[in-house]
Swiss-Prot record:
Pathway: Amino-acid biosynthesis; L-arginine biosynthesis; N(2)-acetyl-L-ornithine from L-glutamate: step 2/4
Native species: Moorella thermoacetica (strain ATCC 39073 / JCM 9320)
Positions that bind substrate: G65, G66, R87, N190
GO terms of biological process kind: arginine biosynthetic process via ornithine; L-arginine biosynthetic process
Alphabetized GO MF terms: acetylglutamate kinase activity; ATP binding
Record bears the keyword Electron transport: no
UniProt family annotation: Belongs to the acetylglutamate kinase family. ArgB subfamily.
Protein name in UniProt: Acetylglutamate kinase
Function: Catalyzes the ATP-dependent phosphorylation of N-acetyl-L-glutamate.
Site (described: Transition state stabilizer): K30, K253
Keywords: Amino-acid biosynthesis, Arginine biosynthesis, ATP-binding, Cytoplasm, Kinase, Nucleotide-binding, Transferase
Single GO cellular component term: cytoplasm
Length: 296
């Protein structure tokens, strides 16, 4: 679709109050899903982050990388095992996870931001003890009894020390964070990227937390894209979970939004990362995209 000059002008005018409103504000973006695989979507996300930075916003990117980790493990002859959606991570697997997330994906994102006119610095939770972590244990039921399963080097966020992020932003760079935490003995932990993004947003007291997903948002009817719930009050969440409207992998994402709101983040969004420039559409247009989770 080709826009006329008048239509392009209208888009810029619509964005103007939002550019003014969010000048100097922090937006934490969880980058994952199809947007990390498709070349055009990769380009769009990088361009979105660069534009936000150039108009005075403070974007912070937290990225995942599950598919690339699984691919690398397969190439090295290691099978991936998951329990409750968490990758069982022994010491050797943790080395591979860290190599892929920190050494490969993180640096590719940094390079692409520079390619499209921005400046970025790649970090992980071990840098400046940004993300202090503790071991996570899976609680399961077997034969009617509750059991704890050791997931290896899978972690939970214990504490976020955002000083290094603030320093990077103050120097004019976009921080790009890999979701690796550091334990009390200096050991590495693999942490869910949504959780890292949420806790980082709280520590930075971000104005927005934006989670990119592979769905339109939260749908009242999962078979009907037109049933998108554009704004969801936290008080409705238990009922929607009970009804099965919020289910599967969407539950931890919604819980992440709730935790962020409780911690002082002003707005949280679950948006469709398969739409080019969905971040800009959410931030700079009247209608936005996806589902906004709000207090209430």
């Amino acid at each position: 679709m080709t826009l006329s000059p008048l239509e392009k002008t209208g888009i810029l005018i619509e964005a103007l109050p939002y550019i003014r409103q969010f000048y100097g504000k922090t937006v934490v973006i969880k980058y994952g899903g199809h947007a990390m695989v498709n070349c055009e979507l990769k380009k769009a996300v990088m361009q979105d982050a660069v534009l936000m930075h150039l108009v005075g916003m403070r974007p912070v990117i937290v990225h995942g990388g599950g598919p690339e980790i699984t691919s690398m493990l397969g190439r090295l002859g290691k099978q991936s095992q998951f329990i409750q959606g968490q990758r069982v991570t022994d010491a050797e697997t943790m080395e591979i996870v860290e190599m892929v997330l920190v050494g490969k994906i993180n640096k590719e994102i940094v390079a692409n931001i520079h390619r499209y006119g921005g400046k970025a610095i790649g970090l992980c939770g071990k840098d400046g003890h940004l993300i202090e972590a503790r071991k996570q244990v899976a609680h399961i039921q077997k034969d009617g009894e509750e059991m704890d399963l050791d997931l290896g080097y899978v972690g939970q966020v214990e504490r976020v020390n955002p000083g290094i992020i603030e320093t990077v932003i103050a120097e004019g760079y976009i921080p790009v964070v890999a979701p690796i935490g550091v334990g009390p003995e200096g050991e590495s932990y693999n942490i869910n990227a949504d959780l890292v993004a949420g806790e980082l947003a709280v520590a930075l007291q971000a104005d927005k937390l934006v989670l990119l997903t592979d769905v339109e948002g939260i749908l009242a009817d999962r078979d009907d894209p037109a049933s998108l719930i554009s704004s969801l009050e936290v008080g409705r969440v238990p009922e929607l979970i009970q009804q099965g409207v919020i289910a599967g992998g969407m539950i931890p994402k919604v819980n992440c939004c709730i935790r962020a709101l409780e911690g002082g983040v002003k707005k949280t969004h679950i948006i469709d990362g398969r739409i080019p420039h969905s971040i800009l559409l959410e931030v700079f247009t009247d209608t936005g995209v996806g589902t906004m989770v709000v207090p209430g």
